[in-house]
Amino acid sequence: MSRACELTGAKANNGMAVSHSHIRTKKLQQVNLQKRRLWWEEGKKWVNIKISTKALKSIQKVGLDKFAKSNGVDLKKF
């Protein structure tokens, strides 16, 4: 599996690491992914999902079902 959020699709960002002498080198800024077991109320079951912490925060605010529908994700595949 790739290092991407299964709900939002967030993945690594290409950036630059800049030293004190201003030498720039390429660097990957990875997404903060967490494996979580969340209760899906509509499906009446637990779903194991690899999601970003930003998505987890949004789920706590609006709920798993509403957040998944707004991102066009079918929770039946988890």
UniProtKB/Swiss-Prot annotation:
- GO cellular component terms given for this protein: ribonucleoprotein complex; ribosome
The record's GO molecular-function terms, alphabetically, read: structural constituent of ribosome
InterPro entries in the record: Ribosomal_bL28, Ribosomal_bL28/bL31-like_sf, Ribosomal_bL28_bact-type, Ribosomal_bL28_sf
Q: Which UniProt keywords apply?
A: Ribonucleoprotein, Ribosomal protein
Keyword Aminoacyl-tRNA synthetase present in the record's keywords: the answer is: no
* Pfam families tied to this protein: Ribosomal_L28 (PF00830)
Q: Which cysteines are joined by disulfide bonds?
A: none
Give coiled-coil spans as residue ranges. Answer: none
Domain of life, per UniProt, equals Bacteria
Q: Does the keyword Ribosomal protein apply?
A: yes
A single Gene Ontology biological process assigned to it is: translation
Family that this chain belongs to: Belongs to the bacterial ribosomal protein bL28 family.
State the name under which the record lists this protein. Answer: Large ribosomal subunit protein bL28
Organism whose genome encodes this protein? Prochlorococcus marinus (strain AS9601)
